[in-house]
Amino acid sequence: HYIYKLSDIVSKGGVLLLNAAPNELGEIPIGQANLLRRLGQWLKVNGDAIYDADPSPVRNPDLPITHKPGRLFFHVKEQVDRELEVTGMTAAIKRCYLLSDPKKTALNFSQSGDRIILNLPRDAFVGVQGLAVIAADYEGEIQVSDPTLRADKEGLIQLPVSKSTYSNMSISYDQKFGCTHKIAMPWD
């Protein structure tokens, strides 16, 4: 949970602060110490995607993406599907590989317009505590496109759930007082 939280926060330009509070003997409690060790183990393998990384110009609520010059990092939660689709950008991707692979074996991928489809190997999530990081080397500039509100050939516009924010909102008009009431309850 904290590993994903770290990736998500860094992908948005933030910093994760953890309060490790020693007990009355000055010792870090075992639960907190274990959490810090797990974070440290993950960072040994995937730290390049966190340290000195900037948020990506591409926003995707389901896929944290960090960025360094010439390289994007896709932070992928463990999933059954071995195919990962990233949309919303046009970049000349040259090579993709898992940061957890010491050999940096190139992953198969295809690119068409603002869509990149990556094929994940069977062992993509082995030893990465549920969050693999794919490095994607690119050349040139990243062009961001947001297909969220683009009409298809029939003129329909679909808003994907991943790009939506739920809000329990109602609007009513009170004739007695001649005013409109808006009641909103965010789902965060």
Which ranges hold each PLM region?
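Mature catalytic domains of secreted/periplasmic carbohydrate-active enzymes
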Residues: 1-187
